[in-house]
Design a protein with these regions (language model features):
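Bacterial N-terminal signal peptides
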Residues: 19-30
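Sec/Tat signal peptide C-region and signal peptidase I cleavage site
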Residues: 31-35
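A short, amphipathic beta-strand motif
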Residues: 41-50, 60
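Extracellular beta-sheet/turn segments enriched in Thr/Pro/Gly and aliphatic residues
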Residues: 44, 128-167
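Short, flexible loop/turn segments at beta-strand junctions in immunoglobulin-like
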Residues: 49, 95-97
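Beta-strand signatures of extracellular beta-sandwich domains
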Residues: 59-63, 106
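A short tyrosine-centered beta-strand micro-motif
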Residues: 101-107
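Acidic, glycine-anchored loop motifs typical of Ca2+
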Residues: 111-118
Length: 168
């Protein structure tokens, strides 16, 4: 009878140890995951200067390389579209899953909803466009290197992009 009591006690002790170790691992993994989440940078893009009389969507594209910048959205690291509300001259978009690195932002006010930049016969934008670092369209769209900025671990960066419309 004594042997059986010891056996039960040993099982209880073993179960306690296993449960304790499992709980410790859960706490450790939770702390590591939380620490990693806190390091993820956040980029807030405020787009200003939307023409109130225009409808459509505002597309904010974040590029992490020169490839496709600024108009080939299929090469953007991440793109968010926001509907234009009547009477609003600004929209805000938050990107909270970007790794640290160099980025450049391009913005399109897609007035006709085709998610593509309409151009004149001379190649100039017919819809509102804007770029990070307040770069403007001159004879051509600004280059990635002129528009780029750095996003660091744990940083909460807010940038303002002002839309420019070509006067017809």
């Amino acid at each position: 009878m004594m042997k059986r009591a010891n056996s039960n006690r040993e099982r209880k002790d073993a179960m306690f140890r296993i449960t304790f170790i499992a709980a410790c691992w859960v706490v450790i993994f939770s702390a590591v995951a939380q620490a990693q989440d806190e390091k993820i940078p956040v980029l807030e893009v405020r787009v200003e200067g939307i023409r109130i009389a225009k409808k459509g969507e505002v597309g904010v594209a974040v590029f992490n390389s020169r490839l496709g910048y600024p108009t080939h959205l299929e090469h953007a690291y991440e793109t968010e579209w926001t509907g234009v509300e009547e009477g609003k001259e600004a929209v805000e978009t938050v990107f909270d899953s970007l790794p640290a690195g160099e980025y450049a932002v391009s913005v399109l006010h897609d007035e006709n909803g085709n998610r593509s930049l309409e151009r004149s016969k001379l190649g100039f934008p017919k819809e509102g466009v804007g770029f990070s670092n307040d770069q403007k369209v001159k004879l051509s769209a600004p280059k990635f290197d002129k528009c780029k900025f750095h996003l660091s671990l744990g940083e909460n960066k807010k940038i303002i992009v002002r839309l420019n419309y070509r006067e017809d």
